[in-house]
C-alpha cells in the first residue's frame, strides 16, 4: 500500500470496509451539494483550478522516508467555494485512474480527507476575507491553505489509526510530515 511516492492518497485494500463505507457516506452527500451549486458561468475557472490541482500533485517534496505533494484544495475552496469539492473530486478520480494515486474503492475516503476540508475551509475563508482589509487577505489565504492541509492530515491519521493499530506509527509519521507542507 505504500509505494514510497505518496501517502496523502490512501490506496485500495488498506482500509477496512467499514471505514471505506463511512468515507462514501460522507463524500456522496457533500458531492451532491457541490454539484448542485456548480455555476455554468464558472466552467473556465473550474477547468483552470482543476488543472492546477492535478499539476500541483505532481510536485513532490521529500519528507523523511516518503514524499508529499501540493494539495491546493484550500486555495481551490477559496476560489470556488463548494464547487471546489467537485473539481478536487475530478482531480482525485483522474489521479487514481491515470497515475495510480489512491484507488476507486477508497475514493470516498480520499474525497472526505482532501476535498471536503478544502471546500469547507474555503467557504470559511471566503466569508472571512470579506471582513478584513486587502492587506490581510494574503494571510487569510495562507491560513486557509495551511489549515486545510493540517485538517486533512488529522483526518488521514484518524482514518489510518482506526483501520489498524499497526498503522498508527505510519499515521503519526504522515501527520508530522504534513506540518512542513502546511507551513
Give, region by region, the residue ranges found by the protein language model.
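Hydrophobic transmembrane alpha-helices
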Residues: 1-75
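Hydrophobic alpha-helical transmembrane segments
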Residues: 17-21, 43-48, 85-89, 107-112, ...
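Hydrophobic core segments of alpha-helical transmembrane domains in multi-pass membrane transport
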Residues: 20-32, 52-56, 119-122, 145-157, ...
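Small-polar-interrupted transmembrane alpha-helices in polytopic inner-membrane proteins
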Residues: 50-54, 84-96
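Interfacial aromatic-anchored transmembrane helix boundaries in multi-pass membrane proteins
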Residues: 58-67, 90-121
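Alpha-helix C-terminal capping segments
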Residues: 76-83
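Short helix-perturbing small/polar motifs within transmembrane alpha-helices
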Residues: 111-157
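C-terminal transmembrane helix-loop-helix hairpin of multi-pass membrane proteins
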Residues: 140-150, 167-183
Amino acid at each position: 500500500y505504500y509505494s514510497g511516492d505518496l501517502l496523502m492518497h490512501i490506496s485500495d485494500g488498506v482500509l477496512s470496509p467499514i471505514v471505506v463505507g463511512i468515507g462514501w457516506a460522507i463524500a456522496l452527500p457533500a458531492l451532491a451539494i457541490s454539484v448542485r451549486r456548480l455555476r455554468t458561468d464558472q466552467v473556465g475557472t473550474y477547468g483552470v483550478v482543476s488543472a492546477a490541482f492535478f499539476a500541483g500533485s505532481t510536485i513532490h517534496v521529500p519528507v523523511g522516508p516518503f514524499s508529499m505533494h501540493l494539495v491546493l484544495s484550500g486555495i481551490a475552496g477559496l476560489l470556488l467555494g463548494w464547487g471546489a469539492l467537485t473539481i478536487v473530486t475530478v482531480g482525485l478520480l483522474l489521479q487514481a485512474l491515470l497515475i495510480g494515486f489512491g484507488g476507486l474503492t477508497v475514493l470516498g475516503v480520499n474525497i472526505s480527507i482532501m476535498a471536503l476540508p478544502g471546500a469547507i475551509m474555503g467557504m470559511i475563508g471566503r466569508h472571512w476575507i470579506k471582513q478584513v482589509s486587502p492587506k490581510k487577505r494574503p494571510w487569510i489565504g495562507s491560513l486557509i491553505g495551511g489549515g486545510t492541509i493540517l485538517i486533512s492530515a488529522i483526518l488521514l491519521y484518524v482514518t489510518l489509526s482506526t483501520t489498524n493499530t499497526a498503522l498508527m506509527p505510519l499515521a503519526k509519521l504522515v501527520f508530522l510530515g504534513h506540518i512542513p507542507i502546511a507551513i
